[in-house]
A protein has these predicted regions:
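Weak global preference for isoleucine
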Residues: 8, 18, 38-40, 62, ...
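Major-groove DNA-recognition helix of helix-turn-helix-type DNA-binding domains
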Residues: 18-44
């Protein structure tokens, strides 16, 4: 059975708040495939997915999610 944190879902707005960015940028991350979402009425991302995203791109410039640059 999945642990409690894998069941937590964030909206795009909540994910933007966690990442300290704006909703439009989170949609760009989704469109680029860098951050995977599920659509249940509106787009949502799992807490675990968001945490893995931060680990995966640590040390990178992802200002443009279509052109990731290693720092």
């Amino acid at each position: 059975m999945a642990n409690e944190s894998t069941n937590i879902l964030y909206t795009v707005k909540e994910a933007a708040g966690i990442l300290k960015t704006n909703v439009a940028y989170v949609h760009r991350l989704r469109q680029s495939g860098k951050l995977r979402f599920i659509k249940i009425g509106q787009f949502k991302v799992r807490k675990e997915t968001l945490e893995n995203f931060l680990k995966e791109f640590e040390g990178c410039d992802i200002t443009d999610p279509f052109k990731v640059i290693q720092l």
